[in-house]
Amino acid sequence: MSAAAPRLVVGLGNPGAEYTETRHNAGFRFCERLADKLGVRFSHESRFHGFVANARDAGVWLLMPQTYMNRSGQAVGALARFYRIAPAEILVVHDELDIPPGQLRLKFGGGLGGHNGLKDTSAHLATNDYWRLRIGIGHPGDRNEVVNYVLKPARREEQGQIDEALDRALAAWPMIARGEWNAATTRLNARPAALK
């Protein structure tokens, strides 16, 4: 398992006001909150196909691709190549259907779980070996409803649980920033008491 501190944090989502509050944009929401925590602002960088922020003090880039979910890898690959960031130094934050709202999973590598943003990212990085922070959004119960489900806002109770999960993820950021992945994984993957 990689022990490198992250040099790039990518939040996956879709651009445009109509998608801002959707379940699929959980990764964007994490990146926006992390930027606030680090005191940096995003600016649009066309060469990287997205909104980019450089937290120089933390030694990390933040990226929100503006390519739509299915082409996220175009932005990730462009920034990673330009700054010579290895896949093991990348953390991709995304929504996860197979995890209930309010729960998180931090992991390195592995399968893509049918997530099109991850599929494209892996294609552009030519590997699955990068860190992922999976933000649970729950499953609609019917696979035919998935597209409609992820492109709608969460119900109020679910959104509260997702927001609490984002708060826990931000609280673990100092560990992640130091490359203390095992400690961060233990902390983030634990089921919150309120959901037990």
UniProtKB/Swiss-Prot annotation:
Give one Pfam family, short name only.
Pept_tRNA_hydro
Entry's localization field: Cytoplasm
Query: Which cellular component, as a GO term, is one annotated location?
Result: cytoplasm
The free-text function statement in the UniProt record for this protein reads: Hydrolyzes ribosome-free peptidyl-tRNAs (with 1 or more amino acids incorporated), which drop off the ribosome during protein synthesis, or as a result of ribosome stalling. Catalyzes the release of premature peptidyl moieties from peptidyl-tRNA molecules trapped in stalled 50S ribosomal subunits, and thus maintains levels of free tRNAs and 50S ribosomes.
Q: Which residues of the sequence carry a binding annotation for tRNA?
A: 19, 68, 70, 116
Q: Which reaction does it catalyse?
A: an N-acyl-L-alpha-aminoacyl-tRNA + H2O = an N-acyl-L-amino acid + a tRNA + H(+)
Q: What is this protein called?
A: Peptidyl-tRNA hydrolase
Q: Give the UniProt record's GO annotations in the biological process aspect.
A: protein quality control for misfolded or incompletely synthesized proteins; rescue of stalled ribosome
Kindly give the PANTHER family that the UniProt entry links to this protein: PEPTIDYL-TRNA HYDROLASE
Query: What domain of life does the native source organism fall in?
Result: Bacteria
Entries under InterPro entries matching the protein: Pept_tRNA_hydro, Pept_tRNA_hydro_CS, Pept_tRNA_hydro_sf
Q: What is its main location?
A: cytoplasm
**Subunit notes for this chain?**
Monomer.
Q: What are the recorded GO MF terms, alphabetically?
A: peptidyl-tRNA hydrolase activity; tRNA binding
Keywords attached to this entry? Cytoplasm, Hydrolase, RNA-binding, tRNA-binding
Which EC numbers does the record give? Answer: 3.1.1.29
Q: Which family does it belong to?
A: Belongs to the PTH family.
The UniProt site entry described as Stabilizes the basic form of H active site to accept a proton is assigned to 95
Site positions per UniProt: Discriminates between blocked and unblocked aminoacyl-tRNA: 14
Query: Active-site residues?
Result: 24
